Amino acid sequence: MGQKVNPIGFRTGVMVGWKSRWYASKQEFSGLLPEDKKIRDFIKRHPKKTQYRQAGIDKIEVERTRDEVKVVLHCARPGLIIGKKGQEIEFLQGELQNLIGRRVNLKIQEISRPELQAQLVAEEIAEQLAKRASFRRTMKRAMEQTMEAGAKGIKVQLAGRLGGAEMARREKQISGSIPLSTLRAKIDWGFAEAMTAQGHIGVQVWVNQGFYAMGDDKDGDDAEEGKASKKPARTYKR
């Protein structure tokens, strides 16, 4: 029976690059890896700046050199993080430096089409469910917007006490094609939780953004070079 592996993890290192890009010795690795998680959690769940949660942060990439830590935020509304004359981004950069005790170089990269990012779609659905919107209508609207934005397919799955029902259940809707086992397919995945009065509702979203072009793969460039040579054509002597 086929198992539902995480589409991003399945393609990482083959078609998709890593979100943390650095090298460390065995002694340093155990300290640096939790540091990356601390950076991501601090930005996404900032104790004071609630507007960061509205900025539509899709992913946070971390690169390390000997001198500094480079943090790249991919978000839909960069103005909420940059602030007036760049004051907010300087403040956040200072907070991150105090948090990890290293020099931080913070960069913001705007997402051109947030409707195609599965994490942002999942967070939008969760936000609507928390406002007690109809779950079926919310799913349908989100799927229509994603397909209109140019997606090849989308799948949305909700799990929990849907509509305030006494018994938790799972409901899913699919539009278009979602080839999860095809590595060339650009499948994005996102997860969010809706905090409702009846309990938590889990939201999972899969978005098919098309196929990777031949030069798009980040870490699979040498896969063709390492391929075994084909056997010579067999000849028959009379």
Describe these PLM feature segments.
Residues 1-238:
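RNA-contacting regions in translation and RNA-metabolism proteins
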